[in-house]
């Protein structure tokens, strides 16, 4: 499995991430496009995509602080859930 930092809305995996993000979390837990761009500008914010071959598997987003990491979102593609990716 490959781990890929998604660091902007211009990243090649951004659209795959956004699709999974919007179907995996209720609207009140989702960022707007503007809010996501602001998160990308913070050094503490990380969005990591996971792929296997050319298949987008899932992602994790987290904030890394000096004494802890806060996992904000984690999701696996609907068709791949229950297969050990999480």
Regions found by a protein language model. Name each.
Residues 34-37, 62:
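Intrinsically disordered, low-complexity segments enriched in polar/charged residues with Gly/Pro
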Residues 49, 54-63, 68-75:
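Conserved beta-strand in the GNAT
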């Amino acid at each position: 499995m490959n781990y890929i930092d998604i660091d902007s809305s211009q990243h090649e995996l951004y659209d795959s991430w956004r699709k999974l993000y919007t179907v995996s979390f209720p609207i009140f837990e989702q960022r707007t496009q503007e809010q996501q761009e602001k998160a990308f500008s913070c050094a503490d914010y990380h969005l990591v995509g996971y792929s296997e071959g050319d298949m987008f598997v899932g992602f994790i987003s987290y904030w890394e602080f000096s004494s802890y990491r806060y996992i904000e979102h984690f999701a696996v593609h609907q068709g791949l859930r229950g297969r050990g990716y999480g």
